[in-house]
Design a protein with these regions (language model features):
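Conserved catalytic motifs of ABC-family nucleotide-binding domains
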Residues: 154
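Hydrophobic anchor residue at the start of the ABC signature
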Residues: 147
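ABC transporter nucleotide-binding domain
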Residues: 177-191, 196-267
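Conserved ABC ATPase "signature" region
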Residues: 100, 104, 111-129
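Conserved ABC ATPase signature
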Residues: 92, 133-140
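Catalytic Walker B motif of ABC-type/P-loop ATPase nucleotide-binding domains
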Residues: 158-161
């Protein structure tokens, strides 16, 4: 048996004339946090539904927990926990009723659910609220409860589909602490997200665009492999005008808006700084600060998507 929890080979899913997942291949090692990144509609959720046995592939193969998703879907489902984008909780049930319900779904006896109940309540921080209706909980509390319900049966692999969507930054950080605890206990965590800062928490990453994997590796490897030229962060007036001017220059490799700043990729740091300053100031745009920065995964994402798009139609997006 290999050291992989998940093995995917040429996985493809077609809906009519639309290819949602296009010959995707990757491995997920046991006990790691694996991030599947991409914009909305890139194919993340379709992939995760196939791996959970909720949707069949058009072609290709995959094994989850050592079992083939096509031939042995029931064996796969016994070994996984799944948390969907909408958390899949029943709003009109109380906290403990939701836990009991999902325990039954996963085949746990009533006695076993009672044994696990305190653990879920403690993990989710919901002691004293077990009789509260789920609809009365904040989004952050619902998120933690949904995770508790998904891992109630102690699965070896957990699939989390956009688990932090619509959650405030503090709740997001707390949720990732829970994910790290799971991974530290030997659970394999497969998480889809479009929050690129969250990908820094992952051991391994795949970036999917238009159904195809376009980049992969650890966060450090991806920055080193896909970003080879200096990136300058420019603080200036009239950011949009500045970006449009820079995009017309042959010596500018890539440019994107990041909040109130510009990120500009150039071939040479010193020469690039001089040219950026000269161009902008000649057009009446004051440059307040310009520094070379360590590239982020967002830089990788934007650069790879622009390269895949060909015409750079994502320039200026964040």
């Amino acid at each position: 048996m290999t050291g992989n929890s998940i093995e995917v080979r040429d996985l493809t899913r077609v809906f009519g004339k639309f290819t949602a997942v296009d010959h995707v291949t990757f491995d997920v090692r046991r006990g790691e946090i694996f991030g599947f990144l991409g914009a909305n509609g890139a194919g993340k959720s379709t992939t995760i539904r196939i791996l959970c046995g909720l949707l069949g592939p058009t072609s290709g193969t995959a094994t989850v927990g050592g079992f083939d998703i096509g031939r042995e879907p029931d064996r796969v489902k016994e070994r996984i926990g799944y948390m969907s984008q909408k958390f899949s909780l029943y709003e009109d049930l109380t906290v403990d009723e939701n836990i009991s319900f999902f325990g039954g779904v996963y085949g746990l006896s009533r006695d076993r659910v009672r044994e696990k109940m305190p653990w879920v309540l403690e993990m989710a921080g919901l002691w004293g609220r077990e009789r509260s209706l789920t609809r009365e909980l904040s989004v952050g509390w619902k998120q933690r409860l949904a995770l508790g319900c998904a891992i109630l049966h102690e699965p070896e692999i957990v699939f989390l589909d956009e688990p932090t969507g619509g959650v405030d930054p503090v709740s997001r950080r707390n949720f990732w602490e829970l994910i790290n605890r799971l991974s530290g206990g030997g659970v394999t965590v497969f998480v889809t997200t479009h929050y690129l800062d969250e990908a820094e928490y992952c051991n391994d990453i795949r970036l999917i665009h238009a159904g195809r994997v376009v980049a992969g590796g650890s966060p450090r490897e991806m920055k080193r492999t896909y970003i080879r030229n200096p990136i300058l962060e420019v603080e200036c007036d009239r950011v949009v005008d500045a970006m449009e001017m820079l995009q017309k220059e042959d010596w500018v490799l890539e440019t994107s808006i990041f909040g109130a700043y510009l990120h500009v990729s150039v071939g040479d740091e010193a020469e690039g700084k001089a040219k950026v300053r000269r161009l902008l100031e000649a057009n009446g745009i004051a440059v307040r600060r310009m520094d070379r920065i360590v590239p982020s995964l967002e830089d990788v994402f934007i650069q790879r998507i622009e390269q895949e798009s060909g015409d750079g139609d994502l320039r200026g997006t964040k």
